[in-house]
Amino acid sequence: MESKYRKRRIILPIIGLILMIITTFFFVKQQRYRKAERESTYQLTEGETQLLQEGDIIFRHGYGIISDAIVKYAKEDYPISHCGIVVLDSLGELAVIHTVSNTLANIDGMQLDKLNKFIKESQVNSVIVSRYHSLDSTLSTRIAEHAKYYLSRQIPFDNNFDCEDSTKFFCTEFVWRVFNEVSEVDLYKLTSSQRVDCMSFAAFLHPARFSIIINHCESQPIE
């Protein structure tokens, strides 16, 4: 009994020290990310901004440990962690509708950010914009209106990442639902027998259906 007690007295402080080191490491890393985001001047050029239209899908690699984890474990063709839909706001200015967990933002779920804010919160040279091949002015408007409809409903973020649950959305699910309900095309279904994971960005970058309008990433596109 005394031997077990001694071992416990030795092991518990070691475990506590390890946990403290890990916590400190992640805290310091997160603070560095916040500093980098605050000081970032990253934006699209004026020429790139003029290329955008409602209904475009915009991707980024955000700042933070969670964003890095998504990039690392998702193993996409591009190092991206988040996406949203480009719209015009009530002032006629470019903005992005997207959904974010309240662990990462002050608002949980659906939100609208000015384009420059969305870009500023992106790691440098991580932004990609894709456009659906069939995106004409009518479809563009309908996609934007449907995205705004979900924004008005204040749909919460889906922390369970369950694409069968239509009461909550994660970022790729939101984009998929908007396009699926407006264009009546299931973007996750590439062919009659091929379907991509609902958490994947690949469906919104596949050359059979999308053109990449802006690409600040250095990785090779999907073949």
What is the meaning of each model-derived region?
Residues M1-F26:
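N-terminal Sec-pathway targeting helices
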Residues E2, V87-E93, E181-V185:
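Secondary-structure boundary elements
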Residues R9, P13, F27-Q30, N159-E223:
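Activation targets extended, charge/polar-rich intrinsically disordered C-terminal tails
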Residues L17-D89:
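N-terminal accessory segments that precede or flank the first globular/catalytic domain
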Residues R60-R131, P156-F169:
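Glycine-rich catalytic cores of cysteine/serine-nucleophile enzymes that process amide/ester linkages
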Residues A69, N125-L190:
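Active-site nucleophile-His-acid catalytic modules used for acyl/amide transfer and hydrolysis
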Residues F118, H146-Y150, F204-P207:
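Residues that form generic nucleotide/phosphate-binding pockets
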